[in-house]
């Protein structure tokens, strides 16, 4: 089960990353002027890059769990750190961008859970959930992909800012 999931997740994550880069290229002129938009576009890229990388590493770790545990731990720390940095800069964003950015806070517990499971693989079993560690991580990765897709959609569908509004945010 886990192998099929991670094969599919890696493919989906990197396909979505490529599609997201098309969106960023399309909105580049508008977003390049806005520091918070550049940060948000990077956040979406990171969702897909981290979930895809974790999925690929899990496929290649074979009978060496230390490999996937290390990769998942590092990815979780990177995701959590990027999220915390994004929240530090939230005060510089216009109100409508802040609403989208606050949705990101939903992912902080997920990134921390990825790190916790990487450190203590029996965590799910310890709390009464009878899943293998990579199956538990698969659920968390699914939720991250779901939130990343929705975050990307919200940014993509956000109407263009008026010139005056984008100048106020700088």
Predicted regions and their residues:
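Generic alpha-helical transmembrane segments
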Residues: 13-17, 46-51, 70-87
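Hydrophobic alpha-helical transmembrane segments in multi-pass integral membrane proteins
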Residues: 51-60, 111-128
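Non-cytosolic membrane-interface motifs at loop->transmembrane helix junctions
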Residues: 65-73, 98-102, 130-140
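Hydrophobic alpha-helical membrane segments
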Residues: 78-82, 101-122
């Amino acid at each position: 089960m886990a192998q099929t999931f991670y094969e599919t997740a890696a493919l989906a994550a990197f396909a979505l990353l490529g599609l997201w880069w098309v969106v960023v290229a399309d909105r580049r002129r508008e977003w390049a002027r806005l520091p918070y938009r550049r940060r948000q576009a990077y956040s979406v890229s990171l969702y897909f890059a981290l979930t895809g990388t974790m999925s690929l590493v899990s496929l290649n770790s074979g009978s060496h769990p230390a490999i996937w545990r290390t990769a998942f731990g590092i990815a979780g720390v990177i995701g959590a750190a990027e999220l915390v940095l994004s929240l530090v800069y939230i005060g510089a964003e216009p109100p409508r961008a802040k609403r989208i950015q606050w949705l990101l806070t939903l992912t902080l517990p997920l990134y921390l859970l990825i790190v916790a499971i990487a450190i203590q693989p029996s965590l799910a079993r310890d709390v009464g959930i009878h899943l293998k560690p990579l199956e538990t991580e698969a659920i968390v990765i699914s939720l991250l992909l779901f939130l990343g897709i929705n975050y990307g959609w919200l940014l993509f569908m956000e109407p263009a800012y008026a010139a005056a509004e984008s100048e106020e945010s700088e």
